[in-house]
């Protein structure tokens, strides 16, 4: 055991039934380093991190912290060993302040000296360069501020080993840069950091070393300075990967969807869309960018009939320019009317697919929604399930297995495959590659481009600004429920889009 290792895993294995999630994995984390963990969906990254954090317990193997073998059976054990984990979905209480969330659940006296505690937390925040109002309620915060609370919470509890799961998934470029500066400050102070991410450019910019997993097995750990995006992706998938994203020129562009004066409110009567005007063309991919909660999700759901509309119009135009008004129609009415619209929601299992159903039954959901008899011939849906499994290389033991057992990337392939099989005129896709590995991401990009070439109007909410600029013809940027600008995907910079996402407007046009 090297004495400079903060953490070492030896021969770690974990299975769930017949599925081998981790297969005799060895891994080391040095003191004062940032280690990136890379792997395709289903490679075992999250399972491995969850064993370090105490959510799962390994079937075999040994874990060492600072040279001593340890047993971690719960997050409480990991806290006591100085290990903290910030999950992609934050675990905060919205009605409490930042300071209250940070101390929530700590052992000690019932009555806390919050003035002294707040001063201590502020010193910790200042030490690493965090910017945070400790008296602010969580529900008043941006996503990046909530993430800051989670990180400080772990540091305040004594974490010197920090695990971050997809830390930049919903951050702007400027927020990501600030986070990286903070993580570098933590490294200088002796913290050891592990990051799970699919963004290769961030791995290359931030990490000291990169560990690669493939199908549950440990492949290698390489020095970041000696790696590049191509070499890392090839180790992840075991073969050559084309990292280029095609963007064919739009052909026969015509108006397909015209949105005017669209206003929506949520259940709390808070405005989520504020007088939105947008035209979507057939034969193009329109990207929707914005900080999480800026109205992108509500915009797609309003078009799909899943969001109540306060006012405004959504007009679907046919090839002759004749319009059908969608405003006021729910999703069932849209399907019954035979309107050719497909929607891939953010919530893949729940809103998109039923986790306990197999692929065939999930193909049949379309028929149920159309109001047809549930006593259907399963031959057609089964054939479609087999076609999607084969053509999109869906990794599943069988099309009869519940989709809940699949990795996120394979679930997304099934969902996208089912929706495009409807031959839609309009395809709405929310976060098509969120949490999806590089290989699966490029499968999704290819499918979207195929729809574009067929003349489909494709609308995508995309959080990765590199991808939105490479894939999309136009980019509509949402900020606070409004469109702050529309940019040409071929000429827009990340900085310009990032500024529009945070209300610093640069002139954009709809042309």
Regions found by a protein language model. Name each.
Residues 2-511:
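Glycine-rich phosphate-binding loops of nucleotide-dependent enzymes
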């Amino acid at each position: 055991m090297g004495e400079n290792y903060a953490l070492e895993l030896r021969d770690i294995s974990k299975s769930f039934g017949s599925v081998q999630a981790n297969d005799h994995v060895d891994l080391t984390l040095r003191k004062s380093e940032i280690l990136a963990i890379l792997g395709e969906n289903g490679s075992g990254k999250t399972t491995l991190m969850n064993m370090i954090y105490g959510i799962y317990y390994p079937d075999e193997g040994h874990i060492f912290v600072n040279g001593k073998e340890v047993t971690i059976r719960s997050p409480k054990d990991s806290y006591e060993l100085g290990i903290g984990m910030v999950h992609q979905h934050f675990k905060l209480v919205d009605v409490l302040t930042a300071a209250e969330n940070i101390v929530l659940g700590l052992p000690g006296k019932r009555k806390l000296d919050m003035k002294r505690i707040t001063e201590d937390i502020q010193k910790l925040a200042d030490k690493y360069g965090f910017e945070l109002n400790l008296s602010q309620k969580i529900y008043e915060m941006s996503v990046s501020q909530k993430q800051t609370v989670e990180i400080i919470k772990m540091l305040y509890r004594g974490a010197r080993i920090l695990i971050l799961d997809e830390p930049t998934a919903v951050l702007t470029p400027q927020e990501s840069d600030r986070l990286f500066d903070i993580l570098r400050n933590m490294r200088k102070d002796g913290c050891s950091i592990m990051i799970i991410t699919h963004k290769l450019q961030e791995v290359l910019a931030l990490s000291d070393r990169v560990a690669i997993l493939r199908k549950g097995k440990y492949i290698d750990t390489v020095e970041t300075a000696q790696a590049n995006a191509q070499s890392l992706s090839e180790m992840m998938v075991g073969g050559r990967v084309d990292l280029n994203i095609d963007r064919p020129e739009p052909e026969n562009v015509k108006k397909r969807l015209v949105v005017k004066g669209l206003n929506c409110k949520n259940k709390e009567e808070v405005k989520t869309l504020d007088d939105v005007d947008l035209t979507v063309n057939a034969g193009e991919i329109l990207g929707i960018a914005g900080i999480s909660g800026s109205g992108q999700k509500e915009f797609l759901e309003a078009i799909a009939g899943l969001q109540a509309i306060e006012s405004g119009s959504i007009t679907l135009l046919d090839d002759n320019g004749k319009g059908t008004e969608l405003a006021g129609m729910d999703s069932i009415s849209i399907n019954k009317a035979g309107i050719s619209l497909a929607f891939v929601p953010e919530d893949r299992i729940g809103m998109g697919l039923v986790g306990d159903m197999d692929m065939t039954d999930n193909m049949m959901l379309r028929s149920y929604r159309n109001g047809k008899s549930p006593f259907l011939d399963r031959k057609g849906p089964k054939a479609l399930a087999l076609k999607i499994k084969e053509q999109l290389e869906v990794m599943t033991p069988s099309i009869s297995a519940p989709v809940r057992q699949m990795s996120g990337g394979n679930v997304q392939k099934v969902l996208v495959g089912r929706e495009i099989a409807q031959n839609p005129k309009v395809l709405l896709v929310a976060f098509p590659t969120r949490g999806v590995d590089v290989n699966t991401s490029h499968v999704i990009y290819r499918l979207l481009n195929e729809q574009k070439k067929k003349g489909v109007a494709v609308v995508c909410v995309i959080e990765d600004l590199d991808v939105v600029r490479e894939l999309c013809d136009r980019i509509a940027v949402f900020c606070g429920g409004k469109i702050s600008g529309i940019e040409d995907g071929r000429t827009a910079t990340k900085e310009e889009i990032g500024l529009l996402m945070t209300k610093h407007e640069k002139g954009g046009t709809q042309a």
